[in-house]
């Protein structure tokens, strides 16, 4: 899964307030040429609506491919090119390999959190109430930590599509760049999660805006942190 010709990339440290700047850049990119992104986002939401009840593992898979396509769109928009399905970005085998890896990682997350939750439920049934409550908090903390760990993969799709690097290296660089820039990363992760939650209140229609804004923010962050 490694590319044969991989460029040398350096991880840069961004100022603490850059997380907000990346989100602002994502909003600016969306405003510049929002129609294809809205269509792409609506198409993804329809696919998720059709397949989520039967195969939830497709959610992170399709989300990863979506991030890669939007990264290609951002590059094309900056160059004034016409966007046609990411000019084949969705056919990139490395992007799909990355998506499968992320999907398997997400499945492992669900299994881990589910096992912890089952343990907490059993302890809550057969132990004192305060022990059950403590395990519930442990379950919530574990879920939060695993979500943050998966969130460090947010830069990988742009690296695979735009930098033409291998899947394993892209994952490593994404995690390393996120950990080297914890405050900007957490800013995007927390505000992004809030944006997605608020968007769902409008029957999910707000996701047509929130999703591309966050994807463009990820592409902007990848361009800045890894050069």
What function would you assign to each model-found segment?
Residues 1-227:
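Hydrophobic alpha-helical membrane segments
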């Amino acid at each position: 899964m490694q590319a044969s010709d991989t460029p040398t990339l350096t991880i840069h440290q961004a100022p603490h307030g850059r997380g907000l700047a990346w989100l602002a850049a994502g909003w600016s990119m969306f405003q510049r040429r929002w129609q294809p992104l809205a269509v792409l986002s609506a198409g993804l939401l329809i696919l998720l609506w059709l397949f989520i009840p039967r195969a939830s593992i497709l959610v992170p898979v399709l989300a990863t491919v979506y991030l890669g396509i939007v990264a290609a769109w951002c590059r094309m928009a900056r160059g004034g090119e016409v966007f046609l399905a990411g000019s084949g970005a969705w056919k990139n085998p490395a992007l799909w390999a990355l998506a499968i890896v992320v999907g398997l990682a997400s499945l492992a997350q669900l299994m881990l959190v589910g096992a912890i939750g089952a343990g907490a439920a059993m302890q809550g049934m057969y132990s004192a109430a305060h022990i059950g409550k403590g395990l519930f908090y442990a379950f919530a903390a574990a879920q939060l930590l695993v979500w943050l760990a998966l969130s460090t993969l947010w830069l990988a799709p742009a690296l695979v599509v735009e930098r033409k690097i291998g899947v394993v290296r892209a994952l490593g660089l994404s995690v390393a760049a996120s950990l080297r820039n914890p405050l900007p990363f957490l800013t995007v992760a927390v505000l992004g999660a809030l944006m997605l939650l608020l968007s769902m209140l409008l029957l999910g229609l707000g996701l047509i805006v929130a999703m591309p804004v966050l994807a463009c923010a990820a592409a902007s962050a990848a361009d800045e942190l890894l050069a």
